[in-house]
Amino acid sequence: MPNACPDGSIGPVRVSGIHHVGVAVADLDAAVATWGRLCGAEVEVRETVEDQGVETALLRVGDGRIELLASLEADTPVGKFLDRQGPGVHHVAFEVEDVAAELERLAAGGAELIDERPRPGLEGREVAFVHPHATGGVLAELVARG
């Protein structure tokens, strides 16, 4: 299986920065309170992303962001993740100028994709997910620059 990172066989994806780290949680309200107490995190956006079956809270932590994800149903990707692994880091999201172009670049290099084309995500931005097989074990999200 091709690997997107250490040997450079796929990409490079044109990344402008890390948009957020996604954390799967069982209870969104409790997690928001915990992160607020822990590091003064403040909610920037809180919304439901129906397409992905999650309620999310995007928290500002210094210069970075954490996206807390609570599953709306057990039979969603985040619900299955929570069932399999419990709460914890779910994905790393990279900000890119053009999600579709980066997906094409990855597909041409043989990367395993979860999404073949962009779909709506948090804040109405286009997003797409790259399978952990292509990244050495980490679920990666591409997020259109806002």
Feature map (PLM): residue ranges:
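Vicinal oxygen chelate
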Residues: 2-14, 18-26, 57-60, 67, 79-105, 128, ...
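Long, hydrophobic N-terminal alpha-helical segment
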Residues: 5-52, 76
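Short, conserved beta-strand edge motifs with alternating hydrophobic and charged residues
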Residues: 22, 67-70
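Hydrophobic side chains in well-ordered alpha-helices
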Residues: 31-34, 102-106
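Short, charged/polar surface micro-motifs in flexible loops or helix N-caps
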Residues: 63-66, 73-75, 99
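Amphipathic N-proximal alpha-helical interface segments
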Residues: 71, 75, 142-143
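Serine-centered coil/turn micro-motif
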Residues: 75-76, 121
